[in-house]
Amino acid sequence: MKKRLPTLLASLIGSALYSQQALADLADQCLLGVPAYTKPLVSGDANSLPVHIQADKAAANYPEHALFSGNVYIEQGNSTLTADEVQLTQRQEQNNAPLRTATATGNVNYSSNEIKLQGPKAWSNLNTKDTDVYQGNYQIVGRQGRGDADTMKQRGDNRYTVLENGSFTSCLPGDDSWSVVGSEVIHDREEQVAEIWNARFKIGKVPVFYSPYLQIPVGDKRRSGFLIPNAKYGSNNGFEFSAPYYLNLAPNYDATIMPNYMSKRGTQIQTEFRYHTTPGEGLVEFDWLPKDRVYSSEHASDGDSDRWLLYWRHNGVMDQVWRFNVDYTKVSDSNYFDDLDSKYGSTTDGYATQKFSFGYADENWDTALSYKQFQVFDTNSSDAYRTAPQLDVTYYKNDVGPFDFKVFSQAAKFTNVNNSYPEATRLHIEPTLNLPLANRWGSLNTEAKLMATHYQQENIDEYNENTGTGRHLKGSVNRVLPQFKTDGKMVFERDMDYAPDYTQTLEPRLQYLYVPYRNQNDIGVYDSTILQTDYSGLFRDRTYSGLDRISSANQLAGGVTTRIYDDQRAERFNASVGQIYYFSRPRTGDITGTWDNYDNTGSVVWAGDSYWRISNQWGIRGGLQYDSRLNSVALGDAVLEYRRDENRILQLNYHYASPQYIEQMLSDISHTGYQQGISQVGVTGSWQLVDRWSLVGAYYYDTKANQPADQLVGLQYNTCCWAINVGYERKITGWNSTDSSSQYDNKVSFNIELRGLSSNYGLGTDKMLASGILPYQRAF
């Protein structure tokens, strides 16, 4: 580990020296004391630009010697030099151009659009622009960074800056909280790298670290090196310390390797590889924790205590028509995200997606060949289906007379992780004819389609005998369903009488949908789940996702939306309310279906959404769904948020799901924590108390279970050259199977950051809010 410390420190200091992004994010107060170049920039060859000299006195012996004294001011291009005295000399050298030099003494100040130098004496070769400043100090223009040196040298036509016994800190003048010093520092602007010999890192005036040699990245070029380390303590993992190392492998790909030490479990190695190539861009992450001591003791029967995660995301487009996408996550065991932190999954995830797709699209065709399966984390679930593979082909032809024509077709092969479950091959074709009519105040779309599906089901005998679902699957099934739909919308607009320059709209919508009934009890459920019915869902064609369940429909969906726009055409308010009126009850014939056992007709489902931007700081958003079949409010949510600025946020929210709704939607979930419904109130926020202190917190309480779901509090102290934050989080990670009680993880985090060492000069509260099990989401 000691061998790695020089590289760690080098990368931290290098980021502070020349982080352009950090400059863009600097708080205004951090620019106090930082010099700024306010004059117009002068372009062109500096050697060809005129030199302007002012002085109280001048004496010359042309062309060998000239002496300027008293308030000497010299300007050339973007550079100026002031001193008590400046002596110019010119000496003819054999077979060479005359050597011209300048020596400045007394209160020497050199400034340009890049740097300011001060010292008692300076020397410059006017031919080569080589310059030396003695016993001086420097300050970077326009960003934090300053220091001093016995000698400061400019070499190689300003390519190299050499400091002898030099120092650097990003702290403002008068604050020397930290600094790095070296016997020699060479900064190469072209290669954007700096080398430091005999480097000492100081906290105040006390040296705390020494390295004989450091090489640090500077400028915008990516350089390999350690990033900012992190430390925290939790009841699940014990003390944790991570030190990410960045690898700049090539201009189009790089990697980050992060050893993450956990005192209770061991050392995890997290490797993230990023690439950008002609076939596309993507990211691959592989995390490896060998011999997890906690997992080994809690799951001794498993035998294998190695924990790992593999994640691959790829998005690629070639020749504007070919596309290849990957969304793949796989972990070693179902408890991985409960035990270990990862940005690619959380404790609330019930499964991990593993999908590959390859497609082609042009003006009339859209095709995709995909493979998809799920790694389900519920140990009681053993019926997860995979599509291996699935082919989707869609043909579009618009403006066929007054009609738009489309044909969607699909071929899919379904297999199950459980060998005792059925497998199926599904073929589907769906031609659609649409008549769109529209003008500036309304639209009417009338659509007719035919849905024809063939199933070839295998391995069904054991399922029919033992499943207990009441379904009786058949080997070969054909299902043909026509569908008719007409959807009308209108938009009325008026100027508001009591609010000048404000505009209100009224947008009624009416949709009739008809699908005849077909008994589908002989078809397995391979990729269909019931869909949530919010306001926009009232006008959905389908009650179920996928193709295995297509519910009958003889219904009229109606709704109305009103919006209010201010004088800048920004939406300040909207409210929507609607319902579905069933002329006959929707059915699929599946006796285990969610809604087949209800015979309600009439106004069955109501839904509403609303949003009110009360002011630039206050906003309200909410939604409500009522289902008469359950005789209760099915779902509800409300959010009230005050946002003064990015560092001052306060949000109050509430989420509700009735027990009846949970029972219908998640009938296979047996845990009592779900069966009693969801009623959860939460408050979250971050607040900059004063310029240097900020507080962040979140608290979510489940009123059904009478217990907190997530608790988070953090405090950060921030200055222009260093920051510190301390955080505490207590979150649910699972349930105790013996007594159904909740299991919690208590975690304390502690971070110190040298300001200027990262690209973010904000207070960091957004990251803390996003780290909770229930991350903060903006209301407006």
Curated annotation (Swiss-Prot):
Keywords: Cell outer membrane, Membrane, Signal
One of the protein's GO biological processes: Gram-negative-bacterium-type cell outer membrane assembly
InterPro entries found in the cross-reference section: LipoPS_assembly_LptD, LptD, LptD_C, OstA-like_N
Location(s) in or outside the cell: Cell outer membrane
Gene3D superfamilies linked: Lipopolysaccharide (LPS) transport protein A like domain (2.60.450.10)
Signal peptide annotation: 1-24
Keyword Signal listed: yes
Principal localisation: membrane
Keyword Signal set for record: yes
GO annotation, cellular component aspect: cell outer membrane; transporter complex
Superkingdom of the organism of origin: Bacteria
NCBIfam families, alphabetized: PRK03761.1
Function: Together with LptE, is involved in the assembly of lipopolysaccharide (LPS) at the surface of the outer membrane.
Protein family (similarity comment): Belongs to the LptD family.
PANTHER family: LPS-ASSEMBLY PROTEIN, LPS-ASSEMBLY PROTEIN LPTD
Oligomeric and partner information: Component of the lipopolysaccharide transport and assembly complex. Interacts with LptE and LptA.
Protein name: LPS-assembly protein LptD
UniProt lineage: Bacteria, Pseudomonadati, Pseudomonadota, Gammaproteobacteria, Enterobacterales
Gene: lptD
